[in-house]
Design a protein with these regions (language model features):
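N-terminal auxiliary segments of SAM/dcSAM-dependent transferases
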Residues: 1-29, 40, 217-225, 229-233
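Conserved SAM/SAH cofactor-binding pocket of Class I
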Residues: 49-135
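Core SAM-dependent methyltransferase catalytic element
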Residues: 190-233
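Short beta->alpha hinge that forms the Motif I/post-I loop of the SAM-binding pocket
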Residues: 93-98, 145, 168-169
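A short glycine-rich, Lys/Arg-flanked "PGG" loop and its adjoining helix->strand segment in the class I
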Residues: 147-159
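Conserved beta-strand signature within the Rossmann-like core of class I S-adenosyl-L-methionine
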Residues: 160-167
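Class I S-adenosylmethionine-dependent transferase superfamily signal
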Residues: 80, 153, 177
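SAM-dependent Rossmann-like transferase core, predominantly class I methyltransferases
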Residues: 13-61
Length: 233
């Protein structure tokens, strides 16, 4: 028996969710998904509103190679797999329970997605590169986790690839994404901030700036050496 039925609109998509005796069902547009989860896996009560806000702005292409970073029970990755194909999607999470539940949900929804245990992107096979990375990072006072997501995510994106993130906080994420990517778009949806950042350079902007600074320092150092050499001759 259904115990809850919710309906909300994000952009042009109608999202419907209902609780079932063994899990819950989520409809996003014409994509229908059935899920089970466990109490310690985010978010145990159903589809997270922040994640839904992020998905409302994501634009997928058939050629995309997508990473669901911090996949939880698998909503984002399964939603993407049903549209662009399971072979185009990778899901990962640091928690064994999340990986187990996400794999079960992939099977329930008929998509054979690779679900990997990884501390952020650190343990993913080096050969994997992506055109889209989607993440609803954990909220902590310490920003070390999202910092790693953003910096390593940039390296794993192909040129022209896009990172989407959703959070309750704006300033730190805006500043970090802008520093690494060189620019970021922010949309406020349903009380959440959705960030979209495109990789336009092969090296992070902050790294390029540091290299330029070091290059100038080296030039000045070489110039001083030349002057010292000429003064001694």
């Amino acid at each position: 028996m259904d115990v809850r039925f919710d309906s909300y609109i994000y952009g042009k998509e109608i999202v419907m969710e209902r609780s079932l005796s063994a899990g819950f069902q989520v409809n996003i547009g014409d994509v229908t998904m059935d899920f089970v989860t466990e109490a310690e896996v985010f978010s145990p009560q159903g589809a997270d509103r922040g994640t839904l806000a992020m998905l409302s702005v994501v634009k997928l292409e058939e050629s995309d190679k997508l990473l669901d970073l911090g996949c939880g029970y698998g909503l984002v990755g399964i939603w993407a797999a049903k549209q662009i194909g399971a072979e185009q999607v990778t899901m990962c999470d640091i928690a064994e329970t999340a990986v187990k539940v996400a794999r079960e949900n992939c099977e329930r929804n008929g998509v054979d997605v690779a679900v990997l245990k990884s501390d952020g992107l650190k343990d993913l096979p080096e050969v994997l590169r992506f055109t889209k990375i989607l993440s609803n990072p954990p909220y902590h006072e310490d920003f070390s986790v999202p910092k790693g997501f953003i910096e390593l995510g940039y390296k794993r994106l192909e040129l022209g690839g896009v990172m989407y993130m959703v959070t309750k906080r704006r300033d730190w994420y805006y500043n970090k994404l802008k520093t690494v990517f060189g620019g970021v778009r922010v949309e406020e949806i349903d009380g959440y901030y959705v960030f979209t950042a495109e990789k336009r350079e092969r090296k992070p902007v902050e790294k390029k700036k540091n290299e330029q600074i070091m290059s100038k320092k080296l030039q000045r150092k070489m110039s001083k050496k030349k002057k010292a050499h000429h003064s001694n001759t």
